[in-house]
Amino acid sequence: MSRASKITFAASCLITAATVVGVHYVQEMERETLHQGPIKDAKRVEEKRLRKTNGVASLDPTKERKRYFNMSEHEEQKELRKKYETMQPLSGEVVTKDGEVVKESKK
């Protein structure tokens, strides 16, 4: 074999070996990452269960603020609904643009 063909063959073998080793390494990393998924999930579920048993007081301040805001917004919306129902009672009927009345079915 000529020198050029030997160099080409050696380079091809090195590139092939590097590719095989690289793919094997990536597969091992992915396998380890997939293995960590259920472990992290179990830890997250356990932390959530502990937070529930300890009550709402264990929430961080930003979550407490957001929860309080949502509760106050909900109360405000309930008051607005009562106010508007007194002004215009809800009948459960839907009137189309043709004037046809469609009753809603109870679920």
From Swiss-Prot:
Entries under InterPro entries matching the protein: Pet117 (IPR031568)
Superkingdom in the source lineage: Eukaryota
Subcellular locations according to the entry: Mitochondrion
Coiled coil: none
PANTHER family tied to this protein: PROTEIN PET117 HOMOLOG, MITOCHONDRIAL
Physiological role: Involved in the assembly of cytochrome c oxidase.
Protein name: Protein PET117, mitochondrial
Source organism (scientific name): Saccharomyces cerevisiae (strain ATCC 204508 / S288c) (Baker's yeast)
Record gene name: PET117
